[in-house]
């Protein structure tokens, strides 16, 4: 199967799930608020929005990711990168639609106010570039993985970091010495500093 056929198959599956009414969305329950190609004319660049896990310093916030897909996908893994920025529009609340162009198009979608965060403080994520260190996105990738299942693995990584493979030394060192109070305080500090409240749609 060619990369484009595989990606079209995945996209159709995502749209089908997002349009299901009266049942919980597996994507939303896994913290995936949005997943789509940047353009339907180019399936090799996608964007995603991930919600932080509950009971962590990441909760009540979401992050955008850029996904660059190689021409030999799914044999080779896509590249996921958290979108980082210092240019945060603090003077207004923006509205995000997560695939929804019309309020009436998706019954059962609820609006929720979350913090749109432009930095990801985490031992396995580069603070200044958004690069991710995760084995299934590198040596342990197999064609059985999909974009949505890989995003689920990234959400799980947020709650279960690997300090021995760090891209953020400061965060990793706090984990290594088991100073969880300082670790969580630093997450909350950066999430507060580099975020703005936005409305998002939650499909359920």
Swiss-Prot record:
Keywords: ATP-binding, Membrane, Nucleotide-binding, Peroxisome, Peroxisome biogenesis, Transferase, Ubl conjugation pathway. The keyword Zinc does not apply. The keyword Zinc-finger does not apply. Its main location: membrane. Gene3D superfamilies: Ubiquitin Conjugating Enzyme (3.10.110.10). One of its GO terms (molecular function) is ATP binding. It is a peripheral membrane protein. The active site is at residue 133. It is found in: Peroxisome membrane. E2 ubiquitin-conjugating enzyme involved in peroxisome biosynthesis. Acts late in peroxisomal matrix protein import, after matrix protein translocation. Required for both monoubiquitination and polyubiquitination of coreceptor PEX20. polyubiquitination of PEX20 at conserved lysine 'Lys-19' near the N-terminus leads to its and proteasomal degradation, whereas a monoubiquitination at the conserved cysteine 'Cys-8' is essential for its recycling. This is E2 ubiquitin-conjugating enzyme PEX4. It comes from Komagataella pastoris (Yeast). The gene is PEX4.
């Amino acid at each position: 199967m060619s990369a484009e056929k595989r990606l079209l198959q995945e996209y159709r599956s995502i749209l089908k799930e997002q349009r299901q009414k009266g049942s919980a969305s597996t994507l939303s329950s896994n913290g995936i608020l949005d997943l789509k190609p940047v353009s339907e004319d180019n399936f090799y660049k996608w964007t995603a929005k991930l919600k932080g896990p509950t009971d962590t310093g990441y909760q009540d916030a979401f992050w955008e990711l850029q996904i660059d897909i190689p021409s030999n996908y799914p044999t080779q893994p896509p590249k996921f990168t958290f979108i980082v920025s210092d240019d945060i529009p603090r003077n207004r609340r923006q509205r995000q639609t997560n695939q929804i162009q019309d309020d009436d198009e998706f019954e059962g979608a609820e609006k929720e106010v979350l913090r749109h965060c432009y930095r990801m403080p985490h031992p396995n994520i580069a603070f200044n570039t958004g690069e991710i260190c995760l084995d299934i996105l590198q040596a342990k990738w197999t064609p059985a993985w999909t974009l949505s299942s890989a995003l689920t693995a990234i959400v799980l990584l947020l709650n279960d970091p690997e300090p021995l493979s760090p891209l953020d030394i400061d965060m990793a060192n706090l984990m290594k010495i088991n100073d969880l109070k300082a670790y969580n305080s630093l997450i909350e500090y950066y999430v507060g500093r580099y975020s703005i409240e936005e409305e998002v749609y939650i499909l359920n």
